[in-house]
Amino acid sequence: MIRTLNIAHRGFSGMYPENTMEAFKKAVEIGSDGIETDLHITKDGVIVICHDETIDRTTDGSGFIKDYTYRELTEFNAGHGEKIPSLDELMDYMKDKNLLLNLELKNDVIPYENLERSTIDKIYEYGLKKNVIVSSFNHNSMQKVKKYDSSIKTGLLYGSPIHNPGEYAKRIGADALHPLFSLVMDKATINDIKRNGILINVYTVNEKSYMKKLIDLGVDGIITNYPNLLKDVIEKLTDK
Ligand code: G3P
Ligand code: MG
């Protein structure tokens, strides 16, 4: 029995415009176990979904999200005629599905003042506490989340090596580590993290050979642009 969770990175972003409702719905339709997505705050305090701090790369507009109102942002095309979604739209879609929702707070470049508090309020509003894991490259922010509510699950993102990651995560009170997958490709590292009681969700794994290796190593979740490929890999390993 393979228990590795299949988490769609920015939705099914390998085939549909990233971080759009289309990409989220396609991920759910093909049977992903969860969705990873990225959060920012508009000028008028609305949490919206986009990877970058600006809308230049992913829409037909330009400029910083923090300088637009939500209403203004909805005028832009995020691909296939899709709009930049609000967190409300995604949560409304997810609220009756028992799937994982990984909300990455994009507060490592712009320190959006109320992103933690506002995200937690949305989690309560939609009754999604048991489904959500909040993550960030900003580990101070994850400690702030725990101060507001210690029962909200948190994950520490990192893209370069850290010393004793399992012990570190435990010490600062996180539930999970979310490493760049190449940083945990050995059994000793995985075992060390698990010994500390910390979950491991790796990003971003788009090749089947790496998916197989990471499943074999026993990671808890794989974040991928191609949940269809990961589904294939899991099904084939299950058939054996
Ligand atoms: O949460 C995993 C992954 O999304 C972190 O990196 O830059 O794709 O948001 P990024
Ligand atoms: Mg992300």
What residues fall within each predicted segment?
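Phosphate-group recognition and catalysis centered on beta-loop-alpha active-site segments
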Residues: M1-K240
